[in-house]
């Protein structure tokens, strides 16, 4: 059973193990989970997951796998064997790819990570989608991919909080993981479709990914506590 008692996931967006662990040392695994992304994992490989789990953290491995079905499924299996709590793949990889990932996890014994689909990145707006041949609103594409993910047996979705309400209404069984969360008064940085933590939960998000407002705070533990207090 997870020790974490909140929906907060802190993004460890750092280039080195030392920097990531320095922040982790200031955080309480009862108050947050942690996310390991491409930069940190490429630098440290599975060692960083092992180190974070050793400190009691649930780890969200945010590598957004996207490849042919067998290759993606084997990557998801490797993540599960690493002991991660959550792993994600791009829904745009298609139904067969997502279903292969679901199947490989069901064939394993022991704890299973949550299998999450990535819909439309929170940095993308309509003009960005048009640039890759999809001349539709991001919300429309999100709903299309969500239906595909549910059909494939995914546990949930990564989505903007602005899509959460519609997704919960259409797919109530899917758990929603929302990046781009910025506490009131924080800079937007490179996220575009954002809400505050309280707004995101009220909209239907189940987990909230928060990066710089905590990781770059003068006192990360205090910043985390403030977010948790906002959600109480």
UniProtKB/Swiss-Prot annotation:
Superkingdom of this protein's organism: Bacteria
Write out the catalytic residues in the record: 64
Q: In which pathway does it act?
A: Pyrimidine metabolism; UMP biosynthesis via de novo pathway; UMP from orotate: step 2/2
Q: Which residues form a coiled coil?
A: none
Q: Which PANTHER family match?
A: OROTIDINE 5'-PHOSPHATE DECARBOXYLASE
**Functional description taken from the UniProt entry:** Catalyzes the decarboxylation of orotidine 5'-monophosphate (OMP) to uridine 5'-monophosphate (UMP).
This one is known as Orotidine 5'-phosphate decarboxylase
């Amino acid at each position: 059973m997870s020790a974490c008692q909140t929906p907060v996931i802190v993004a460890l967006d750092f280039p080195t193990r030392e920097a990531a662990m320095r922040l982790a040392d200031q955080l309480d695994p009862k108050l947050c989970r942690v996310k390991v992304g491409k930069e940190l994992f490429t630098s440290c490989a599975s060692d960083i997951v092992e180190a974070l789990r050793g400190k009691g953290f649930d780890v969200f491995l945010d590598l957004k796998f996207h490849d042919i079905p067998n290759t993606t499924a084997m990557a998801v299996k490797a993540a599960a064997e690493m002991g991660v709590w959550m792993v994600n793949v791009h829904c745009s990889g298609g139904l067969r790819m997502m279903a292969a990932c679901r199947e490989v996890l069901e064939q394993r014994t022991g704890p299973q990570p949550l299998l999450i689909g990535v819909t439309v990145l929170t940095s993308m707006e309509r003009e960005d989608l048009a640039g890759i041949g999809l001349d539709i609103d991001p919300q429309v594409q999100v709903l299309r991919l969500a239906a595909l993910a549910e059909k494939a047996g995914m546990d949930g979705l990564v989505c903007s909080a602005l899509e959460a309400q519609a997704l919960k209404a259409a797919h109530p069984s899917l758990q929603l993981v929302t990046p781009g969360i910025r506490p009131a008064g924080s800079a937007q940085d490179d996220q575009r479709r954002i809400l505050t933590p309280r707004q995101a939960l009220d909209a239907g998000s189940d987990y909230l990914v928060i990066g710089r407002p905590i990781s770059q705070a003068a006192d990360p533990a205090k910043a985390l506590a403030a977010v948790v207090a906002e959600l109480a």
